[in-house]
């Protein structure tokens, strides 16, 4: 009996935070476990009424030795709004977005898809050095971006180009970054797809996994201290969630009560490592309650489910100063990057299922068609127009020179120190002597 009671309490803890999905998040007075608690008043009890007084946990004593089995805890449910045919399942969960906003969602997703195809092929042709596509995960980017304020700070990993796309980041700057030309905001110093834009509150991407998580928590803590009325959103994958930085960030956010949304894209693979080898527990959302973080699991291929969850998490994170964890279940249809061949670790049939049967773009297109907001002629015209827009930006980026080599030494110090100036002069002498061995005509003078 004691075993059953203990197991039921653990089960209720996990289910209680996600069973009702957004209904729970919408409770106006509810607070996550991250809230600070007043010191517990020590009381005297008789031996017959002995209750735990430990300050580190809320629990009861039991008198039988038993370890809690992980399989006793049911999986956190997956919240969704639309089925795979684009039909609203529960009318009360319909976000009732206006036609213009839904069309922007769709056009952002399809434009991103078109850009991915062109830049992937350009890398295969040797025109750029590296690329990472977003196939199959467009709904997680755009659905979450649409639910944020434009001033909310974004910390991405390396597969969130759709967030910038939704914030109207110009195609010319996407291309400039991948080509590393003179129009690149980062002046050619980053790998391709490592975007950043101060004006759109998108922090420059860093390659090392999960380093952005504690950084994002620090930014959220600063926003809280400044009463900035903004949220920080931090994107990462289920593989990055295994890094130590993720665990430190979760605990930091909970104990300091930071207005942050942890957004995990669980796409099934961390490069070649499947989720079955990545963790043994119930995914990433199940970790939230252990840190005292309000958590939810959503269908990442349902752009409306992603929108609703992010919208509500944002509202409460700002109003109540507490962190939220969203695990968006999706699938990485493309290779991890142009350096990867995913056929070595997964089947073509597996990929085709997600591409043909459960793609976020197809699901939203079904919704648009059912509403009478889109038709086949508009689809053909938009596909043609979007490809033309991407190709124009692509050709423009290809014609522009690379940044001047002297920019290697700028933007670190307000005034260049003597040692750095010495290195700059050394490079200039080297290029003057051996310039014929370098493609200097490709660089800005």
UniProtKB/Swiss-Prot annotation:
Subcellular location(s) per record: Mitochondrion matrix
N6-acetyllysine: residues bearing it: 356
Transit peptide, residue positions per record: 1-45
Phosphothreonine sites (modified residues): 338
Keyword Transit peptide on entry: yes
Region named Disordered: 33-52
Record PTM Phosphoserine, positions in chain: 337, 339, 347
Outcome recorded upon mutating residue 438 to N: In MSUD1A; decreased solubility; loss of mitochondrial alpha-ketoglutarate dehydrogenase complex assembly; loss of 3-methyl-2-oxobutanoate dehydrogenase activity
Consequence of substituting residue 190 to K: In MSUD1A; decreased 3-methyl-2-oxobutanoate dehydrogenase activity
Keyword field contains Oxidoreductase: yes
GO cellular component: branched-chain alpha-ketoacid dehydrogenase complex; mitochondrial matrix; mitochondrion
Outcome recorded upon mutating residue 253 to T: In MSUD1A; loss of 3-methyl-2-oxobutanoate dehydrogenase activity
InterPro entries, per database record: Alpha-ketoacid_DH_E1_comp (IPR050771), DH_E1 (IPR001017), THDP-binding (IPR029061)
Catalysed transformations (reactions): N(6)-[(R)-lipoyl]-L-lysyl-[protein] + 3-methyl-2-oxobutanoate + H(+) = N(6)-[(R)-S(8)-2-methylpropanoyldihydrolipoyl]-L-lysyl-[protein] + CO2
Keywords assigned by UniProt, alphabetized: Acetylation, Disease variant, Maple syrup urine disease, Metal-binding, Mitochondrion, Oxidoreductase, Phosphoprotein, Potassium, Thiamine pyrophosphate, Transit peptide
Gene Ontology molecular-function annotations: 3-methyl-2-oxobutanoate dehydrogenase (2-methylpropanoyl-transferring) activity; carboxy-lyase activity; metal ion binding
Binding site for thiamine diphosphate: 158-159, 207, 239-240, 265, 336
Modified residues (N6-succinyllysine): 356, 380
Enzyme's top EC category: oxidoreductase
Job of this protein: Together with BCKDHB forms the heterotetrameric E1 subunit of the mitochondrial branched-chain alpha-ketoacid dehydrogenase (BCKD) complex. The BCKD complex catalyzes the multi-step oxidative decarboxylation of alpha-ketoacids derived from the branched-chain amino-acids valine, leucine and isoleucine producing CO2 and acyl-CoA which is subsequently utilized to produce energy. The E1 subunit catalyzes the first step with the decarboxylation of the alpha-ketoacid forming an enzyme-product intermediate.
UniProt name for this protein: 2-oxoisovalerate dehydrogenase subunit alpha, mitochondrial
Gene coding for it: BCKDHA
């Amino acid at each position: 009996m004691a075993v059953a009671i203990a197991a039921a309490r653990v089960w209720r803890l996990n289910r209680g935070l996600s069973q009702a999905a957004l209904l729970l998040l919408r409770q106006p007075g509810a607070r996550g476990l991250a809230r600070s608690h007043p010191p517990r008043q020590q009381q005297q009890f008789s031996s017959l009424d002995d209750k735990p007084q430990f300050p580190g946990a809320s629990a009861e004593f039991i008198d039988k030795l038993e370890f809690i089995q992980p399989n006793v805890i049911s999986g956190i449910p997956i919240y969704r709004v639309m089925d795979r045919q684009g039909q609203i399942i529960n009318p009360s969960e319909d976000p009732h977005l206006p036609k213009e906003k839904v069309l922007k969602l769709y056009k952002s997703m399809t434009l991103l898809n078109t850009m991915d195809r062109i830049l992937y092929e350009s890398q295969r042709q040797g025109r750029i050095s590296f690329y990472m596509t977003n196939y199959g995960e467009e709904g997680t980017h755009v659905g979450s971006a649409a639910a944020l304020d434009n001033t909310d700070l974004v910390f991405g990993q390396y597969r969130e180009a759709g967030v910038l796309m939704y914030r109207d980041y110009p195609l010319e700057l996407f291309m400039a970054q991948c080509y590393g030309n003179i129009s690149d905001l980062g002046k050619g110093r980053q790998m391709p797809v490592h975007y950043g834009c101060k004006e759109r509150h998108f922090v420059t991407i860093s390659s090392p996994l999960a380093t952005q998580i504690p950084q994002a928590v620090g930014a959220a803590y600063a926003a809280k201290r400044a009463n900035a009325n903004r949220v920080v959103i931090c994107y990462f994958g289920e593989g990055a969630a295994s890094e130590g930085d993720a665990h430190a960030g979760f605990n930091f956010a909970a104990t300091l009560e930071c207005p942050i949304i942890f957004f995990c894209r669980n796409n099934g693979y961390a490069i070649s490592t499947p989720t079955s080898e990545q963790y043994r527990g119930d995914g990433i959302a199940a970790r939230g309650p252990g840190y005292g973080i309000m958590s939810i699991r959503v269908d990442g291929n349902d752009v409306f489910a992603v929108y609703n969850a992010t919208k509500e998490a944002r509202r409460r994170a700002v109003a109540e100063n507490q962190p939220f964890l969203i695990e968006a279940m999706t699938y990485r249809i493309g290779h991890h990057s142009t350096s990867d061949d995913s056929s070595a670790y997964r089947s073509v049939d597996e990929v085709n299922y997600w591409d043909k049967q459960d793609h976020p773009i197809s699901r939203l297109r079904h919704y648009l068609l059912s509403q009478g907001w889109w038709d086949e002629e508009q689809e053909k015209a938009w596909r043609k127009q979007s490809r033309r827009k991407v190709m124009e930006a692509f050709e423009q980026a290809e014609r522009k020179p690379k940044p001047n080599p002297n920019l290697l030494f700028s933007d670190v110090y307000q005034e260049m120190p003597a040692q750095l100036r010495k290195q700059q002069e050394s490079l200039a002498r080297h290029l003057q002597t051996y310039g014929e061995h370098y493609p200097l005509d490709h660089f800005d003078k």
